[in-house]
A protein has these predicted regions:
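Amphipathic alpha-helical segments at domain termini/boundaries
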Residues: 1-82, 225-265
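Short coil/turn segments at secondary-structure boundaries
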Residues: 57-60, 90-95
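Charged, alpha-helix-enriched surfaces in structured cytosolic catalytic cores
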Residues: 9, 39, 67-74, 94, ...
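Glycine-rich beta-alpha loop segments
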Residues: 53, 78, 82, 92-94, ...
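Conserved catalytic cores of soluble enzyme domains
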Residues: 158-265
C-alpha cells in the first residue's frame, strides 16, 4: 500500500476511487467503467503535476525522504547487469550503509557505489538507515582505487541523512574517513558520475558525492545540515523546519543555480 504525504491527500482520494472502480470492473466489466477509470487516471496525472509544480522546500524534503522512494539497491537492480557486490574495508569491518560492486551499464563495465537506507524495518537497521561509519567510507575508497587500477568508471548514488554520529564512529576516525574519501574522489584517475537520488546530507553525502558530473533528481535535496538541525541551532526551536528548509536553499533548482550540480533529472 502506498504511503501518502499530507499534501498528497487529493491523490490518495483519487487512488482509492481507482481501486474501487477497478474492483467493480473486475466483477462486472463494462465500457463505461473502463472509460471512467481512464478519466480518473488522467485526473491523477494532472493532480500530481499541479501539486508538485508548487511544493515548498520543506515538502520537497519530505518527498526526498519518502519511505516508498527507490533506494540505491533498486537502481542497481533496474540499471546494472551482472552486478557483483564487494564488501569490507580490509581494515575493520563491513558497513552496509554503503554498498558497492562491479557490473555493466549499457554494456560497459562500471563500479557502482552508493548509500543504502533499506526499505523496511529489518533492512533499515541492517543498513544503519543509510548513515555510514568510517569503515563504509574506507570501503568506498578501496573500491574506487580498484576501479582506477582497471580503468573502470564510477557511478555513485547519494542518499543519506548524514554520516553516523556515534561515539564508535568518532573513535575510529569518522572525519578523517570522510575527508580521505572526498580526496579520493577528487584525485581519482577515472570518471565519476554522481547521482543524488534522495537526501544529500552534509559531509556524509559529499564524501562519495564529488565527481566529474553531478546529477540530481528533481525531488531530492542537498544540504550542509537538515532543516530540523538548522531550526534547532538558528531558532532554538524545532518547529521552524519550514523556514529552515527555505533558508538552506537545498532543492535541485537551488543547487543548479549555484553550480553545485550539473544537471537536474
Amino acid at each position: 500500500m502506498s504511503t501518502y504525504l499530507e499534501f498528497e491527500k487529493p491523490i490518495e482520494v483519487l487512488d482509492n476511487k481507482i481501486f474501487e472502480l477497478k474492483s467493480l470492473n473486475d466483477s462486472a466489466p463494462s465500457e463505461s467503467l473502463l472509460e471512467e477509470i481512464t478519466n480518473v487516471e488522467q485526473e491523477i496525472n494532472d493532480t500530481y503535476k499541479k501539486i508538485y509544480s508548487s511544493i515548498s522546500p520543506w515538502q520537497r524534503t519530505l518527498v526526498a525522504r519518502h519511505t516508498d522512494r527507490p533506494k540505491t539497491q533498486h537502481y542497481i537492480e533496474g540499471l546494472i547487469e551482472n552486478f557483483f557486490p564487494l564488501s569490507g574495508d580490509r581494515a575493520f569491518s563491513e558497513d552496509k550503509a554503503i554498498i558497492g560492486g562491479f557490473g555493466k551499464f549499457r554494456g560497459k563495465t562500471v563500479l557502482v557505489i552508493g548509500h543504502e537506507k533499506g526499505h523496511d524495518t529489518t533492512s533499515r537497521i541492517e543498513h544503519n538507515f543509510g548513515m555510514p561509519r568510517p569503515e563504509g567510507y574506507r570501503k568506498a575508497q578501496r573500491l574506487m582505487k580498484l576501479a582506477e587500477d582497471f580503468d573502470i568508471p564510477v557511478i555513485s548514488f547519494v542518499d543519506t541523512p548524514g554520516a553516523y554520529p556515534g561515539v564508535g564512529a568518532e573513535q575510529r576516525g569518522q572525519s578523517e574517513a570522510i575527508a580521505k574519501t572526498t580526496e579520493c574522489c577528487l584525485s581519482l584517475g577515472v570518471p565519476i558520475v554522481v547521482v543524488i537520488i534522495g537526501e544529500g546530507g552534509s559531509g556524509g553525502a559529499v564524501a562519495i558525492g564529488t565527481g566529474n558530473t553531478v546529477l540530481m533528481l528533481e525531488n531530492s535535496i542537498y544540504s550542509v545540515i537538515s532543516p530540523e538541525g538548522c531550526s534547532s541551532i538558528l531558532w532554538k526551536d524545532n518547529s521552524k523546519t519550514v523556514e529552515a528548509a527555505s533558508a538552506l536553499k537545498l532543492t535541485a533548482d537551488d543547487m543548479l543555480k549555484i553550480d553545485v550540480i550539473d544537471k537536474i533529472i
